[in-house]
Amino acid sequence: MPVVLNEKKQAEYIIEKGEVGNKPTSTLFLLAKYYRQKENLNKEQTFNKLNEFMEKNYKNYNSATWEDIIEDISKKANKYPLREIDYIEITKSEIDTIRNVCNIKYEKLLFTMLCYAKLYNKISDKNNGWINTDIKELFRVARVSVKY
């Protein structure tokens, strides 16, 4: 699942459109966070809502197969706050610093890393500019390939 800045809006969109996506577990976790934190549902109510969502929108859904997963997701959904970030602020100075590299591949990668660092800084006060994203994901998002 790609990085979602505003998980509340994304969850509302998923509910409206009934889109399970390529990673159903990620979708369910996002919906569980929404149900627990925005609609104030308890674990059991969240479990029922997720089960209902899957029955309605996931082809060949088998509740017995998904029961443990949905139960676990419903429990953990309150542990992680639902993100509601509308933008990541990038300054002209930061853009100028990146442009000084004078290599488009490096510039793309540095810009991507800056965005991730600022996102993680908004999510956690303790982050301090750290990027905890797989290097392959950074290259994919930056649309940069590496040749050996």
Residue spans of the language-model regions?
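Modules that initiate DNA replication and primer synthesis
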Residues: M1-Y148
